[in-house]
Each structure stands twice: as C-alpha cells, then as structure tokens.
Amino acid sequence: MQPSIRSYLRTGPGYVYAAHSGTARETGRIACLASNENPFPPSEAAIAAGAAALATVNRYPDDRMTDLTEALKRLHGDHTFVVGNGMDGIIETVLRCFIGHGDRVVVSTPTFSFYGIAAAGQGAIVENIQRKEDFTVDIPAFTRACTGAKVAFLCTPNNPTGTVTTPAEVRKVLDGIGDCMLFLDNAYVDFARDDYRPLMGEYENLIIGRTMSKIFGLAGLRVGYAFIPAWLEPFYMKAATPFSGISSVSAAAAVAALADREHRERTLAHMLEWRERVRSAVRFPVLPSEANFLMIDVAPHTADDVVATLAGRGVLIRSCRSFPGLGDHYVRVSIGDAWENERFIEEINRI
C-alpha cells in the first residue's frame, strides 16, 4: 500500500517551467527567451573564482556565507543579509519562520506563482488579491487583505507583467499592515529606476529578496539573497536546513561577480536599449516594463498557440496562461542578445 500524499500536492498546482532550449534543438540555434535569463556569460572573474573554489569542495561551505555577506554589505550598505539556494530557498525558509497550518498569506496577483505554492506547502490559506486592469497593485485592497495575515508577497518589478510598485506605495502598504511580514521580491530591480533599500532601516516587518540570476548571469549557480531585519536572523538560521545556503563554488563566483561593476553596467546598458527596441518593434500591444522582459497581448491568438508556433521556428518564449488571473492571451519574452531579439521580432510579427 502506498503511503498517503498530502492533499495539496494531489489537488494544488505545481510550478510551471518555461520551455528549455532542448525542446527545439532540431531547428538549429535557439533564441532562448522564455526564462528571463541573462543572455551573456557571467563575469570572467566570477568564472575564474568559481573554478578555483572547486579545489576545496571536499569541505562544507561556511553556513553563514561570511565572504558573500560582507561583499553584499560593501555593495548595499551595512544591513543584515541571508543567502539561499535561489530566492525560492529563502522564501521557503521565511515561510517556515512564520507560517503554521491555517495561517493566512496574501499575494498580489498575477505574479510569480511560487509564493502561493510554497505557502500552501506550509499549510497556509493563500489569499490572492487581483491587480488593477493596468496590472499595478490595488494598494488599498492589498493593504486591507494583509490585516491579520502572517506574510504578504509583493513583486516589483512584477513577474510576468513588468509593472512596478513605487517605494512610496510600498511605504503605504507597510504603514497599514501592522505586524504582517512583507516579502518584497526585487529580483528584477537592477533593470528598474527605483531603489527600495532605504526602506530597510525603517521597518521591522520588511524582507527584500534579490537574486544573482539576472543581471549577474549566475542563474545556473542558484544564488539568492535577502535583506532581513536584524531581529529575524537567529530565527531564520534556526528554520534553515543545514548548509542550505549555496555551494562554496557558487559563493566564490558570486563574490567576484559583485565586484565586477563593468560587467554589470555593460549588461544593463544592453538590456535597457533592447527592451525599448523590442517594445517599439512588436506589432502587438506591449505592457510598459521595468524588468528584463516584456509581456505582450497576442489576442485574438492564444498564448499557447503563439508559443508553440514560435518554438517550431526556434524561438522560445513563455505563455502566461499558468499565471492566475491573466487569461489565455498574454506571452512573456525575455530580452536576449541582439540576434535573439531580432529573431523574436521577425517571428512574432509573422503571427
């Protein structure tokens, strides 16, 4: 007899992955624009540092990731940082700190689906608060919903819409949610105009999550980190599984990547230029975005049909049908290298 699986795994949604390049390999070179990745290799210094760290992988990594957290302080200021296996790992640990069976978690949707999936895994009741028609956050509705909730998730720039919630709006939320912990997902903030770091010194119920998968190009190394209130750190470390941060190879590469300002600025300049060029060249309506991707309304076509058609032509993009509240007509495309972007423009305009 098979042991009983938890009901949320039987009935709830799982995370839907974007298409991988192997799904269209037979077409030749692939334009991989489905996963909001950096199209360029990481910093040469990061590659060298990661390779050098392989010599000591017989030893466990520093559980506090001291070298990396000190590098983060040099870049961001003297805050308290934790490091995790992608931001996903940090999200799960934060939820273990606060959530018990039946506790409420609030999510501003449509957004990154893992918030709700991870919260359900902790036994939470997940309340999705729909964004407005322009996909900006309904601040009053979101703030009201947070009353009595344990944790709330807000992504800015938002995945998959690219829309932003300004620091002033985030402050309004924080001023109105009492002791609810707000997890502010800043995965794409390097491509945006606003800076949310000044909020960290003002609120004891704010966590700001960030990643090195995007502008730093370390997606395959799974380096996430977060600014957390100092009071939370000992509880976070208790909730984390042993050595649940990142590998010593990933940590060494991350420290070197943080120091390579030229690589970061070169990537940003490319992304900002091509984000506008792609937006203006596509014949379908494109939402304003401050991320490294664009969301496009392909109606009257369905998102799945457009994604399948482009995949057959060697261009991989993401259907947004799996994001609750988005319907069947939106696709998301990452900003790639020049060749990838030109291929996408050519093929989407043939639809």
From Swiss-Prot:
Modified residues (N6-(pyridoxal phosphate)lysine): 214
Pathway: Amino-acid biosynthesis; L-histidine biosynthesis; L-histidine from 5-phospho-alpha-D-ribose 1-diphosphate: step 7/9
Enzyme Commission code: 2.6.1.9
Coiled-coil region list: none
Top-level lineage group: Archaea
Pfam family, one: Aminotran_1_2
Keyword Amino-acid biosynthesis in record: yes
Cited CDD domains: AAT_like
Catalytic activity: L-histidinol phosphate + 2-oxoglutarate = 3-(imidazol-4-yl)-2-oxopropyl phosphate + L-glutamate
Cofactors required: pyridoxal 5'-phosphate
Keyword terms of this UniProt record: Amino-acid biosynthesis, Aminotransferase, Histidine biosynthesis, Pyridoxal phosphate, Transferase
InterPro entries hit by this protein: Aminotransferase_I/II_large (IPR004839), HisP_aminotrans (IPR005861), HistidinolP_aminotransfase (IPR050106), PyrdxlP-dep_Trfase (IPR015424), PyrdxlP-dep_Trfase_major (IPR015421), PyrdxlP-dep_Trfase_small (IPR015422)
GO biological process terms, semicolon-separated: L-histidine biosynthetic process
GO molecular function: histidinol-phosphate transaminase activity; pyridoxal phosphate binding
Keyword Transferase annotated: yes
Database matches in HAMAP family: HisC_aminotrans_2
Family matches, as PANTHER family: HISTIDINOL-PHOSPHATE AMINOTRANSFERASE (PTHR43643:SF6), HISTIDINOL-PHOSPHATE AMINOTRANSFERASE 2 (PTHR43643)
Family: Belongs to the class-II pyridoxal-phosphate-dependent aminotransferase family. Histidinol-phosphate aminotransferase subfamily.
Name listed for the protein in its UniProt record: Histidinol-phosphate aminotransferase
UniProt gene name: hisC
